[in-house]
């Protein structure tokens, strides 16, 4: 199962929009959706690395997109092989 991570922060209107966009896409593709607030994460480097480009979408830990999400591109990625299959 792929993991889609939405990097966000409080007060980010675009992040709310992208979250609403990701919910049905992840559900339909059978992917797990996680939301991480970069300002409250255990990793302080997240805010430094991504804070000026939010929202950022990661797929299986790799950056997929920022600001805008192309539905078809994301679905194609989620239809591909899971690099961590069998690690559970």
Predicted regions and their residues:
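Thiol-based oxidoreductase modules, predominantly thioredoxin-like and allied folds used
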Residues: 31-43
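Short, low-complexity, intrinsically disordered N-terminal peptides in bacterial proteins
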Residues: 1-3, 24-32, 79-88
């Amino acid at each position: 199962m792929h993991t889609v991570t939405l990097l966000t922060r409080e007060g980010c209107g675009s992040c709310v929009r992208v979250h609403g966009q990701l919910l049905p896409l992840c559900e339909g593709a059978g992917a797990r959706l996680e939301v991480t607030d970069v300002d409250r994460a255990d990793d302080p480097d997240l805010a430094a690395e991504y804070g000026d480009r939010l929202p950022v979408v990661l797929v299986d830990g790799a950056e997929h997109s920022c600001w805008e999400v192309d539905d078809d591109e994301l679905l194609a990625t989620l239809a591909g092989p899971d690099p961590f299959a069998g690690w559970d």
